A protein has these predicted regions:
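Gly/Ala-rich beta-loop-alpha elbow adjacent to hydrolase catalytic centers
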Residues: 75, 79
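Patatin-like phospholipase
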Residues: 2-74, 84-316
Length: 316
């Protein structure tokens, strides 16, 4: 009967099956057309944006449905959070459910101090609960997590050891969250050094870099509504000014339409995920071309501009 509640769910399920079959057909066709052709190592760079980062889940959904093999992931701020959970092995279906239940207080608590208005220590219990593994070495997909050394201003990239504190550091918005101390170094949000971590992804061996930029449209004619707007707009301006630095290391930039969402709009997770899906589907034709070309040769790789090296962490 028209209007039956389960009908829409059934239709969506059928559409998902059709897309999966179509993706499998394309994959088999590629293999038949070019047997033994090495597929370039595709890396995914997930930028920051707080609640807007839910759009990353939509991007990942499309990549999985279309069987696009992501070999390496690097994340900044919320991109590090989403990337860590995904690379640990949590299914996208589970990740989407988690996203719908998230609020600001899932990760943080208000605690006014000389260094910030909130602590993201609740992220420890959140990550302990949702991560399938707790160390970089055990991740199913290699992951780089960025942060910024507060004293030197240099970017730091984590690839080994415990995942939880590096993700906390990557999400530590200056002025909002307290800095995170790791091995004697005070670290803050990775967006200050790597708004979208394309350079670390290249250093990790990515031959094709797909960058996801959560471009915010800052207000030019109205006052900010709250602290989130002040800090979020400040970061958006900085990201825009630094765009030429990280875009040069990207082969393709995907920009979900998140301009109408606030940095604390966790309750709109469904809309944000959908925005990521729409943007990624528009970019699919270009990404599919990567699967039809051989992996980058050492000569071609050397032709790229030199990339800045992150500051090393001291040994344990």
């Amino acid at each position: 009967m028209p209007g039956t509640p389960g009908r829409g769910v059934a239709v969506k399920g059928f559409e998902k099956i059709v897309r999966s079959v179509q993706a499998l057909g394309r994959e088999l066709s590629r293999k038949a057309a070019a047997p033994g052709l090495p597929i370039p190592a595709i890396g995914l760079a997930l930028g920051g944006g707080f609640a807007r980062g839910m759009a990353h889940i939509g991007v990942l959904k499309v990549l999985e449905e279309e069987r696009i093999p992501v070999r390496i992931v690097a994340g900044t701020s919320v991109g590090a959070l989403i990337g860590a959970v995904y690379c640990s092995g949590l299914s996208l279906e589970e990740l989407e459910k988690v996203a719908h239940s998230c609020r600001f207080t899932t990760f943080a608590r208000w605690t006014v101090s000389r260094y910030g208005f909130a602590s993201n220590d609740r992220m420890v219990s959140f990550l302990t609960r949702v991560l399938k593994v707790k160390t970089f070495e055990d991740l199913r997909i290699p992951l780089g997590v960025t942060a910024t050394d507060f004293n030197t201003g240099k970017g730091v990239v984590f690839h080994s050891g415990s995942i939880i504190d590096p993700v906390r550091a990557s999400c530590a918005y200056p002025g909002m969250f307290l800095p995170v101390n790791i091995r004697g170094r005070w670290l803050v949000d990775g967006m200050l050094s790597y708004p979208v971590p394309t350079h670390p992804l290249r250093d990790m061996g990515a031959e094709r870099v797909l960058a996801v930029h959560l471009k915010g449209q800052w207000s030019k004619d109205s006052a900010p509504r709250n602290l989130f707007d002040v800090i979020g707009q400040s970061f958006a301006i900085a990201q825009d000014m630094m765009g030429h630095l990280w875009r040069g290391a990207a082969d393709l930039v995907v920009e979900p339409d998140v301009a109408g969402f606030g940095y604390d709009d966790f309750k709109r997770a469904g809309e944000l995920i959908r925005a990521g899906e729409v943007a990624m589907r528009q970019a699919l034709p270009e990404v599919r071309k990567w699967l039809e070309t051989p992996a980058e040769t050492p000569v071609a790789a050397k032709a790229r501009p030199a990339l800045p090296s992150p500051a090393p962490m001291p040994a344990d």
